[in-house]
Amino acid sequence: MAKMLKDALKTIEKYKSITPHYGELLDILGEILILREEYRRKMKKVIFPIDEGLMEKKIFGGLPLIDFSTGTFDLTEPKEYFTALLEIAEKRAPGETKEVLQMIQDGNFNYEKMISDSFNSLQDDDIAEGIDDDVIDLVDLFLEESLRPALEKVVEKYGKSVAKAGWTEGYCPICGKEPKIGEIREEEGRRFLFCTQCGFEWRFMRIKCPFCGNEEQQTLAYFSIEGEEKYRVDVCNECKRYIKTVDFRETKEEANLDVEDIATLHLDMLANEEGYD
């Protein structure tokens, strides 16, 4: 993990010189990665226990190992990490998250419910009233990140077993979240999807939409920007969803998809402009 962190920070520095307009975001990401590793190292409790006897049934039944809709978890440590993340943002932009930090101190921010709601796309944002949209986006990002150290522990312990089990769904087999980015790698050009919620990567069909399961080649497409062919946006014209894809096979680089997700935000904007979600 220490080497991965070191490599990620080097990549961030490289991208800051190539794409200076993302400099501030990349700086924040660097701080988050350092803090993530710190919290992961000091986390002693098992926050997301896995019933190993049910693992095989869950995987073959298309169910993620962790069920956030019905599970009850002690989220004390993730909540501490969430508060620390808000403090990073407040330090960089005073006043940005002050209101949310005050809500936490006053007991008016139900962190546990917000986490549960983040796994249910039908739920509305409880904090939306009177708070700037940019701050809500930041809070959503930090809610997701706050679980990452604890979920990485699950990935470390069970990731290899899950990878061997042949998961075929487009959502994460560990936590159930949908991917935002993936990569093409190995000589055979295999496709892997990446979960920004827990950090797990799993193999997935090249010609298939991870969101609706569409396999009709004529309704699946991709586009890229001239000069940035190592990045592309895969789109599905059935469900109008998209996913970013990284292909570093020519350059032989190793992709850190946490960093690449930030470094390719312009592709998200482009996909949205083209009518994809």
What are these regions (language model features)?
Residues A2-G159:
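N-terminal alpha-helical interaction blocks
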